[in-house]
Curated annotation (Swiss-Prot):
Record keywords, A-Z: DNA-binding, Repressor, Transcription, Transcription regulation
UniProt-listed InterPro entries: LTTR, LysR_subst-bd, Tscrpt_reg_HTH_HdfR, Tscrpt_reg_HTH_LysR, WH-like_DNA-bd_sf, WH_DNA-bd_sf
GO biological process, one term: negative regulation of DNA-templated transcription
Tagged with keyword Transcription regulation: yes
Described purpose of this protein according to its UniProt entry: Negatively regulates the transcription of the flagellar master operon flhDC by binding to the upstream region of the operon.
Protein name, entry field: HTH-type transcriptional regulator HdfR
Domain HTH lysR-type as annotated: residue spans: 1-58
Biological source species: Escherichia coli O45:K1 (strain S88 / ExPEC)
Any GO molecular function: DNA-binding transcription factor activity
Entry-linked HAMAP family: HTH_type_HdfR (MF_01233)
Family, per entry: Belongs to the LysR transcriptional regulatory family.
Residue range(s) of DNA binding per entry: 18-37
Amino acid sequence: MDTELLKTFLEVSRTRHFGRAAESLYLTQSAVSFRIRQLENQLGVNLFTRHRNNIRLTAAGEKLLPYAETLMSTWQAARKEVAHTSRHNEFSIGASASLWECMLNQWLGRLYQNQDVHTGLQFEARIAQRQSLVKQLHERQLDLLITTEAPKMDEFCSQLLGYFTLALYTSAPSKLKGDLNYLRLEWGPDFQQHEAGLIGADEVPILTTSSAELAQQQIAMLNGCTWLPVSWARKKGGLHTVVDSTTLSRPLYAIWLQNSDKNALIRDLLKINVLDEVY
């Protein structure tokens, strides 16, 4: 039996709501419904009664519940033991491309320079979208996530690492927003909520990317502007702030599993400044 089906069953039984279960599992609601139907077809019984938003376990669902919990607990323990033997010296860090390019690349270098912390460790620098990395963290496929937005889930620990400043940059001096095309560099879902007010509600990005390097290289060719970290942009050179723009402060968080067996190691690694300028 597919353990993902049991995992979905347990989440729906816990939340009694397909939408909330989908949110917790980082799936669409239709995917959750499909998994429940698959499990019901395999068992030949209905597991839930559905009356509008009132979802309850059937008698068969109630009987399955303790077995599903035991099976998932055993499976998680097995995965943990196998993973521990195969990757006890490995440590994976996940973040978006722009965070790696603008600040985490330098931090990784500092980790390697600090012999006391990294002795024997094999680091993996993983690049992906935040939602994918949160899922990997939840499933113990990732050790540490660096992000601009802390997930609101009880099983995660979080540490505020500091703040960095974003400014709107272009390739030539004395430019106004109205004269430039907008390139959207992804800085997290909460940043996008502010974008309309910062750029203009009717501004359609000419390019969307998660890479700061790519965005920086394209702004001259596209007569564009994009939000970049101030400290990084100054080091790159050849960039100018847009005259009629503002700056924005963004938080940076470290996220890891509360019951991670690498808790002590994570806290040691985070003693080495992630940001060049912390305030």
